[in-house]
Amino acid sequence: LSLLMSLIFTFNILIGKETLQRQSRNLLHRVLGDTRMARAMHVISTLDDCFHNYIVGQCTEAVILGTLCTIGMMLLRLDYALMLGTFVGMMALIPIIGPYIGAAVGCIMLFSISPAKALEFLIYLFLLQQVEGNLIYPHTVGSKLKLPGLWVLAAVLIGGGMMGISGMVLFVPLTA
């Protein structure tokens, strides 16, 4: 029920986006005045840019991961390389648990063909995840946010320690 209500709410926001923006600006202008309104709009614009760039970085990282997974699986001559590589890339958009979902689905599919191929896939994906998580992700997302990779890793670790998965997602663009 809450999912349905969320979809309805989102749909209504999208339909009346321009009206909602105009009404929100009028309300903020009346409450804050000219000077504070200009500062508030600057902060909102900066946050919008940061979150937009973060999402673009996440999508870029997912495409890179999916492509590397597909290429590696083809080189290892594993079955379903294109399908599983695409799936792993899409699952990379889900913070923390996404890679595990991709690995589990791929392992189950390959296990039905050969347990050895499933193990080979898991080892390859584990190594790829290490490279992706420690090198590719900080560089890709960091470059979109104009933030050094070290700060991206620090934001993920601190955010995760303070707020769990949601902190990992929110702290990177907030750090920028």
Map each language-model feature to its residues.
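Helical mechanochemical/support elements of P-loop NTPase systems and associated helical scaffolds
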Residues: 16, 20, 43, 47, ...
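Amphipathic alpha-helical segments that mediate coupling or scaffolding at interfaces
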Residues: 27-30, 54, 90-93, 108-111, ...
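Alpha-helical transmembrane segments of multi-pass membrane transport proteins
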Residues: 60-61, 116, 129, 147
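Canonical bilayer-spanning transmembrane alpha-helix
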Residues: 72-91, 123, 139-176
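Hydrophobic transmembrane alpha-helical segments of multi-pass transport and channel proteins
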Residues: 93-100, 114-115, 130-132, 158-169
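Membrane-interface alpha-helices
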Residues: 107-121, 125, 175-176
